[in-house]
């Protein structure tokens, strides 16, 4: 009797006995299979590099333009506030557009499209001859940033296998931090116009690399492009044996082939994950991260640290990069919730310290200098002026270890596939509208009430974030996107039975 070409393998099927792979062989095989996923992820997160670079562009530029002799470019307090905050307004518009583009063009093409407003915005700022050009360029780069913030985490989560999704999910934040650090470093060397010119480079490289990368298999399946989806998954896994994973994804997509109706949106399986993702992005901004990053040098000038504010900003950027690297390594080991707890606790301590310092420690007559006072000698005061730098480093470290990267990752993990494109855009819209309000009114609040008031407010939000994590956020470590989505069909608060 002729043997079938394919048959089910049983316990007695030993025609081709297998020798168990050694740990080293398994590690090399896994690295080989993940190499293409890493390449596709790197190509995508170059958009986050540009986002991080553009976000803090004002940090070295505002002090320079405040001293500008050109009346068309000189900034007063109100203009500086708008120059710093209009980026977030553009980012909110980018998040709004992502609600349409994410599902219309797909994740990859939406990321590539973001390069257009980004490149134009940098070019306008580089050649700015008036405040309106600075604001327009800043808003365009913000629009690109909001679009990438909604599209890149979704793309990365949909192409990554579960065992490395936590580490790869941290790369958007990692590259955003690296972009900010690059801006701080270049700000020590280049004038503000050339900083805008330098921002064009990562955008062009991103377009070039993404042209050769596949689209998300889940998106392709949702558009009934099954053959392309299988080819994309096979390329990403560097393996022809992807049919089991492909069938899992295909079954899940087919069950959710239609859009979410308003009636379904009121069901817990839909609104619970969306609400968790939106509130996480809302609380993330209320911790104070965006105004602190945008006005970092201004904060250091007002707290009179020992080192020049430009060097302080670069040091903080380096600490932020190191912290995100730690989060990327530990996220799949410690889990998401542990890092969120640690992150919120550290940010609370840092914000409270900054508020108490501003409230009770007297300032010198001029920034970055010391004077003799009755209660404190010169040496003691010099040591005290390290507190704002150390506390800011602690805040950035806490944020970058948890609430920075994990909110991006969880947004893409918990959102249901049928609503993922629209809901991720909604998350970014809420996030950046919140950031706009905070950034626009931060300097006004400081001038009216003092620098300590915003820091006390941020510390209270960090306590609220701890409570929210414990009550509402599920642990998604090691779960496939299909398992996470199935979990929200239950009414349990944890994966544990």
Swiss-Prot record:
Matching SUPFAM superfamilies: MFS general substrate transporter
Membrane topology: Multi-pass membrane protein
Side Cytoplasmic, residues: 1-36, 102-115, 160-171, 215-273, 334-337, 407-425, 469-497
Disruption phenotype: Mild metabolic effects. Mice grow normally and glucose metabolism in male or female mice is normal. Minimal metabolic effects are observed: female mice display a minor decrease in fat accumulation when fed Western diet and have a lower respiratory exchange ratio when fed chow diet. Mice also exhibit a subtle phenotype in response to lipopolysaccharide administration, characterized by slight changes in the metabolome associated with glycolysis.
Extracellular topology ranges: 58-80, 137-138, 193, 295-312, 359-385, 447
Transmembrane stretches, start-end: 37-57, 81-101, 116-136, 139-159, 172-192, 194-214, 274-294, 313-333, 338-358, 386-406, 426-446, 448-468
PROSITE patterns documented for this protein: MFS, SUGAR_TRANSPORT_1, SUGAR_TRANSPORT_2
Pfam families in the record: Sugar_tr
GO cellular component: lysosomal membrane
Any one Gene Ontology BP term: regulation of glycolytic process
Protein's cellular compartments: Lysosome membrane
GO MF entries: transmembrane transporter activity
Tissues and organs where the protein is expressed, per its UniProt entry: Mainly expressed in brain and spleen. Also expressed in lung, heart, muscle, liver, kidney, fat, whole blood, testes, ovaries and uterus.
Positions bearing carbohydrate: 302, 368
Residues reported to bind a D-hexose: 173, 284-285, 408
Matching PANTHER family: PTHR48021, SOLUTE CARRIER FAMILY 2, FACILITATED GLUCOSE TRANSPORTER MEMBER 6 (PTHR48021:SF59)
Family: Belongs to the major facilitator superfamily. Sugar transporter (TC 2.A.1.1) family.
Protein name: Solute carrier family 2, facilitated glucose transporter member 6
Lineage: Eukaryota, Metazoa, Chordata, Craniata, Vertebrata
Gene: Slc2a6
